[in-house]
Amino acid sequence: MARTEVYNKKKNRTTSLIVFSLAFLFILSSIGFWVVYPFPSDEKVPYFTEDYTMIFEEDIFNKQAMFSNQLYIPYTFIKQHIDSSIQFDEESSSVIMTTDQKVYQMPSDSLNYYMNNSKQKLSFPVLKQENGNLYLASEWLQKVYPMEIRYFKDTKAVQILEHDQILQKATMRATEDEDLRRMRTSPTLTSPYVAELSEGVELFIEKDTKEYFKVRTENGVAGYLKKSVVQLNGTDRIKAEVQANKIPFKPSIEWPVHVTWDGIYQASANPTSQPDLEGVKVLSPTWFELQNGEGDIRNIASKSYVDQAHEKGYRVWALFSNAFEPDRTQKALSTYESRQKMIKQLLQYAEIYNLDGLNLDFENVYEQDGPKLTQFARELTPLAHEAGLVVSMDITFISESAMWSKFYEREELADAVDYLMVMAYDEHWGSSQVAGSVSSLPWVKRNLNQLLQVVPHDRLILGVPLYTRLWKIEQGENGKKVSSESFTMEEAEKWMKERDLESKYDRSTGQDYVEYQVPDKSITYKMWLENKTSLAKRAQLVHQFQLAGIATWSKYFADDEAWKTLDEELSHRKIVQKSE
């Protein structure tokens, strides 16, 4: 082969390699340029795909409003995003809504509604039903909820804004670049756009990203704009027709509260006179009991009891019990009508007997009925406050027991009533097969710490037992048999004295403890005492946990020293050693 031919082949190969390399570099640089400087999208997409779309907290919701002579908002939207406590009562075909001062009932498709059982008239229905869906009139909603509802006629969209919400105002700057005038669906020029804006268009800033603002126009359309074309112009604050501030009901009673329950189960058992109970401020007689599922209430109250109590300076918060009957309770709580029947009776009794408050004692309730019990409290409290009554409710510590603990919606109940009274006893029930304290101090503290995670300390009253249990443990051929009986303080002292026994302090429970072995028999008695030692510690928990006070169960079990001890300890805070 000639040298010239070889040289030409090498030259052609080199030229091809150079051309290929240049082409590759051009393609690579073009791709890189496109990545760094992408072509803006010219695709326009609709922001609203349906009429009456809801806008709330920057988000769009599929639940649509309805226009029927005026704007209506879906009930389901209000319940999920504005007021979780609003209820629909199927039997009366009404929506029930409560505030701290009012109870509203809105019958479906009616020009009348009820506020605290007083009929109100409107020129439009507050509640409408359409195709199986419920809707509430926006005009009425703005009179009871702290919010502003805006309707944009040109886009047929609805925006809900909350009272005191701050809106960052802005305007569109002038720009010749068409692509920068377009609001994008995401913070990039390659995304589709929903609208093209002109200079001076007023905007509200909803989100600040790295290079973009998410903005919303005055007709509800939202999208992303480059920060360079947005001029910030100060802020607006939403001022709703109704303010968000809750007006608390303040009972005219000094801190710390000391309530004592007065166990009365027959009308004939009402005392004819009231003793002097040192430090006690409130008596709570067990007078009212749910009689049946229709909501009738058994009443054994006494006007002379209240009159004498008032003369002694006591307030009277009468107790209303569900009789611990779950089926009866379920039926009575199931409808607005039956709940109102109970409420009307209680308010009538409160007026007749000149009561100062009501104490709700619902126990042994099906777990699924817990929300209905909460609703009952919500519906009772505003009407009770209107009558000048304090509302308290008894609860247990948090546990896994469905019918004695889990049905209590403690956080919601704390918001519905004035005080929650935690029954801090029955650590060991009377039927327990393990002998133990009614309420050991470490058990109380541990459970208080847990409960105070969901209940405000200044709304919580600590239940204090004034009774003890005498435990009898018998060893027999068939094993161990455990039984108990309740003792008053005086009965416990008498039992010890008859056997010449002295108690010893039990550090593990924070109580005095006594044990007795029956001679020549396989019988042992054990008793964890409620006396000056334990009561002083319990009263100091009010200071330690900054609680509202105590409620003692019950007046019948106490001796004179108990009242004196509790009063002294509630009046003075002590420095508690860690070992205690």
Predicted regions and their residues:
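Primary recognition of N-terminal secretory signal peptides and signal-anchoring hydrophobic helices
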Residues: A2-E211, I238-I253, R573-V576
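A short macromolecule-binding patch
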Residues: N219-V230
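Glycan-binding loop/region signatures in secreted carbohydrate-active enzymes
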Residues: A240, T468-R538, E568-E580
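Hydrophobic faces of well-ordered beta-strands that scaffold small-molecule active sites
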Residues: H258-D262, K281-P285, V316-F320, L358-L360, ...
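Catalytic domains of carbohydrate-active enzymes, especially glycoside hydrolases
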Residues: Q266-G293, Q345-L358, K537-G549
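Substrate-binding surface in catalytic domains of secreted glycosidases
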Residues: G293, I300, D369-T374, R378-M496
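Substrate-binding cleft of extracellular glycoside hydrolase catalytic domains
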Residues: H310-L358, F362-E363
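Active-site groove signature of glycoside hydrolases
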Residues: I343-K372, Y419-V434, A551
